[in-house]
Amino acid sequence: MRFLPYLCTQKRIKNKLAMKKQTMITLALALTLAMPTLPAFAQKAMSKKEIAEKEKAFKNLQHPWKGKKVAYFGDSITDPRIKASKVKYWGFLQDWLSITPYVYGVSGRQWNDIPRQADLLQKEHGDDFDAILIFMGTNDYNNGVPIGEWYTETFDSVRVALHKPSEMVQRRHRHFAMDKNTLKGRINIAMSKLKQMYPTKQIVVMTPVHRALFASGDKNIQPDEMYENVRGIFFDEYVKAIKEVGNVWAVPVIDLNSLSGLFPLYDAGAQMFNKPNTDRLHPNDAGHSRMAKTIMQQLSALPCVF
């Protein structure tokens, strides 16, 4: 029996050591969880094999527009005959996403040319395409087209029933303004035609990029966008109107004016355009590549087909 106190003492010591060990483990775990994550530059560099695997995975990403047939409506920035760039934005999209391009953009055209381009698309390809991208508006600004209004209003009778027997009442009634002499009227005419011609085709509108000096001889000198046009309207008013198309006509709008980052108003940004001294209107290859990257990322969030 004389060993009993000794055994009890040893047991107490073991218990204390076990508790101390558990406390240390708990403390270490808490410190680990509380420790801030190391910044990326402190992490172990990837091996060449890991890099190759990630690049392969990126290339294999299934973009929703990959391999689709897309029609492009627009002006000189879309026109394949304009030599400011060897590859247009739609050409880069063709390379990167294997998109088949049907290009109808013509230099100098304005929003009132969209119905003609739509008719040509229908004549050449019928219904055998997936989507339409519209990149238009800079020439409407340059030619001083008034902005106009989206709607006209009348007071009309309409039958209404709201928790009581129906009755005829007078209410304001909106109608799309189909004025071919204003920007919004032209857009309404174009979108009305497209929505009825192709009700189940994805239509995407893009805002015009920033613009600076363009000088092509004595009879074609276009000041930069910091000057009002002949109507006393600044360029950004046209951009704002085109952005509104999304809600008026239920179409996605890619705001290239902001998202592309192209800014030719400063000399530093002129490197993305054709000629720093005379053409800061038309992007060069680098500018078109930047536009295409922006468009590709924006399209990744949109279905190409209904």
Regions found by a protein language model. Name each.
Residues L17-L27:
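Bacterial N-terminal signal peptides that target proteins for export
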Residues L38-A42:
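Sec/Tat signal peptide C-region and signal peptidase I cleavage site
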Residues A28-P36:
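Bacterial N-terminal signal peptides
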Residues Q43-S107, N112-D127, I132, D267-G269:
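Serine-esterase "nucleophile elbow" of acetyl-processing enzymes
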Residues K11-N15:
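Polybasic, lysine-rich low-complexity intrinsically disordered segments
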Residues W96, A118-F306:
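Alpha-helical cap/lid subdomain in secreted, periplasmic
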